A protein has these predicted regions:
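Long, charged, low-complexity, helical-prone intrinsically disordered regions
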Residues: 1-214
């Protein structure tokens, strides 16, 4: 029936979400429109699972602090530290704070270059993976420009490693707004990056602007 069909596919995920939550299907990497069956489930003890998840976190999110990990896993810092003490973590000083990572086997010592300008999705893991008030990528003065009081996390514009603005697409128009004024050359660099990333998305217009009234 129509009602049954609406319950299968709805704005909250419907049947797709239910199958994903239960561990039956997952999205294909780099292709949000395709799904695959999850590998057979193998249960493990809670303590071992916490260890494995922490290992994955510091491998892919590090350098991260104890506070970051506690925030991400929603565990008390004392409990998180006991888990971290079991890992062969590498300690680093980043922005005056002790942080840790877990390099993958055979990892090169030189990190690859990343683009100077990146358009992050809303609720991006670069923002969710760290305690928001101490995130190295998010200057404190711009916190409320990305994290709203109602729980929304806006798509962020990352410039030279720092969140410098936010962006959205509405009615086939991309608008990127900087949080602080920059010169015309910088605006042009952001616009070219937008054209590079979204040039095949059928946009009618790309607008990169300084904050209103500044």
């Amino acid at each position: 029936t129509r009602e049954e069909g609406l319950s299968v596919f709805n704005a909250w995920g419907g049947l797709i979400r239910l199958l994903a939550v239960r561990g039956h299907i997952c999205q294909e990497a780099m292709d949000p429109g395709r799904y695959r069956l999850c590998p057979p489930f193998e249960s493990m003890e809670r303590e071992k699972a916490a260890f494995v998840l922490a290992m994955r976190y510091f491998t892919h999110f590090g350098p991260a602090s104890l506070r970051d990990a506690s925030y991400y896993f929603q565990k008390p810092q004392a409990q998180m530290k006991r888990i971290m003490d079991q890992l062969p973590l590498r300690q680093k000083m980043v922005d005056g704070m002790v942080r840790y990572d877990l390099p993958e086997e055979g990892e090169e010592s030189v990190l690859p270059d990343i683009p100077d300008i990146l358009f992050l999705a809303g609720f991006d893991q670069l923002l969710l993976g760290f305690q928001k008030k101490a995130n190295s990528f998010l200057p404190a003065r711009h916190l409320r420009g990305i994290f709203t009081m109602t729980g929304i996390i806006h798509p962020a514009l990352l410039v030279s490693g720092d969140v410098a603005g936010r962006w959205n697409i509405n009615a086939r128009k991309l608008t990127a707004t900087l949080f602080e004024p920059v010169n015309k050359r910088r605006l042009a660099l952001v616009e070219r990056a937008a054209q590079r990333y979204f040039g095949n998305e059928g946009l009618k217009e790309i607008c990169v602007e300084n904050p209103k009234g500044r």
